[in-house]
């Protein structure tokens, strides 16, 4: 029988033991994995998870569930410890790891997670109940091609107030997906707002096709057209 001493012998000085993570998303081998604390994200995603599906380019991993944060590819060597993950703006949380490839729109991903936390708000405090709703409205406008100058600053302002004023952990962490995507993928927000362009090709309202003179009117393309 191995007790607490054996468990504490694994991991790092500040983050001892092991942690179970749920690998999901654009990963070749998803599922539940138990790893010693201190293993890097790269080791978890590539040595255990087998890498990105269809050998696409790794873009980010969302850690900590819907109120966690997105960690970009250039931080893939970050050790999986509570303190190191916190430094990125994400959290270890319940152990969720949602992997994203180059075809993932980070603005739409932030909208998706915020929609969940907005729905889960108990409604007791105004900061969470109304603040997350206002943030979601801005994100929906941006992904629908109706972003405005000042939207990014408004998102940051609302996020700060929600984190400071919410009564419980849900509201205090709800803005994390937005804040981390703004921190690491701000250019995608700017592309959506100012260039009306979704580089990942995920936001249908920002996809535009031009019919050239070469078109014969066969309608074959209509079966594949996403808009």
Predicted region positions:
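Redox cofactor-anchoring modules in respiratory/redox and cofactor-processing assemblies
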Residues: 1-208
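Iron-sulfur cluster-binding cysteine motifs and their immediate structural context
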Residues: 127-133, 210-211, 220-227
């Amino acid at each position: 029988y191995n007790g607490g001493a054996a468990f504490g012998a694994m991991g790092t000085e500040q983050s001892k033991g092991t942690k179970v993570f749920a690998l999901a998303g654009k990963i070749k081998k998803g599922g539940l994995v138990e790893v010693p604390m201190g293993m890097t994200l790269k080791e978890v995603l590539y040595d255990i998870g087998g890498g990105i599906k269809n050998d696409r380019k790794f873009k980010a991993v969302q850690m900590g569930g819907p109120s966690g944060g997105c960690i970009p590819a250039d931080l893939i060597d970050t050790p999986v410890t509570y303190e190191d993950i916190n430094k990125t703006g994400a959290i270890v949380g319940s152990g969720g790891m949602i992997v994203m490839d180059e075809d993932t729109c980070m603005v739409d991903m932030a909208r998706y997670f915020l929609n969940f936390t907005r729905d889960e708000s108990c409604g007791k405090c105004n900061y969470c109940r109304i603040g997350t709703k206002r943030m979601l409205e801005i994100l929906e406008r941006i992904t629908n091609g109706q972003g405005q100058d000042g939207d990014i600053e408004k998102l940051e302002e609302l996020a700060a107030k929600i984190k400071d004023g919410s009564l419980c952990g849900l509201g205090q962490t709800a803005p994390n997906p937005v804040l981390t995507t703004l921190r690491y993928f701000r250019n995608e927000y700017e592309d959506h707002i100012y260039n009306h362009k979704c580089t990942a090709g995920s936001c249908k309202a920002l996809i535009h096709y031009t019919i050239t003179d070469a078109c014969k009117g066969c309608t074959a393309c209509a079966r594949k057209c996403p808009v």
